[in-house]
């Protein structure tokens, strides 16, 4: 590996520090670098997009002597980039706010319109409707199981007393999906952009103003970055939709995007209640927090 890095990057390696299974901190006479093994050779296309659009929010990749992004080592592939020191001391709320500012910049800079057929919306709506019906059946079965029990655990009572919220949320998902169907019936384009799809506090370097990972970047609807964040909401303990203002104040969603986002967020995620009662209470509490959070965002998107 030392000889390969010297030949490919003209760097003299002193040693390696394993950070994760795929990431190594490489100490060279020229300084510190990040070596990351990747499986997706399509990353070259992503980097080309980033460089072509002159996106400043990502850590630059060091190209090898062949001017390529990726370098092969035995049966593996890796890329090399500058090493940035972690800034974990920064308050998470500030990191999250900065992350959404980066998303709004990434999305707005890379937007383009893409032509679609009528069948695209038809399939999309059918797929979402099927998922909603599956969730309704799933939660109805859990409710039925709790209803026949002579003794209910604390989790059982939490579920029974809050089942109406789940039921209402899924009902709203179907109603919003109907609104979405009515609105897109005459559309023949969608707005696509680069989406990040990989929120992680460790990837956010505020001091340098960079996101250090781009392995999961895809071309998609911008709303999926917001949707994916809400699937992680149990990990976040602050007022999520207020922090989202740092995104919405810089980027205005189209009406069809708002409707689709609202619909997807109302598709209640699946929870699994098992034999660990303490864990079950935590799972239920997180679900209730999710329902409250999307209710707040739904009002905001409806008003906007």
Model-predicted segments: where are they?
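ATP-binding pocket architecture of kinase catalytic cores
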Residues: 31-121
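ATP-dependent phospho-/nucleotidyl transfer catalytic cores
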Residues: 119-194, 242
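Active-site activation/catalytic loop segments of kinase-like enzymes and analogous catalytic loops
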Residues: 222-253, 265-291
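ATP-binding glycine-rich phosphate-binding loop
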Residues: 3-28, 64
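Regulatory N- and C-terminal appendages and interdomain linkers associated
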Residues: 1-12, 164, 171, 175, ...
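A glycine-centered beta->alpha junction motif in the catalytic cores
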Residues: 77-91, 111, 140-149, 267-283
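Active-site acidic catalytic loop and adjacent metal/ATP-binding pocket
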Residues: 61, 174-226
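Helical subdomain adjoining the active site within ATP-dependent kinase catalytic cores
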Residues: 148-153, 179, 183, 277-304
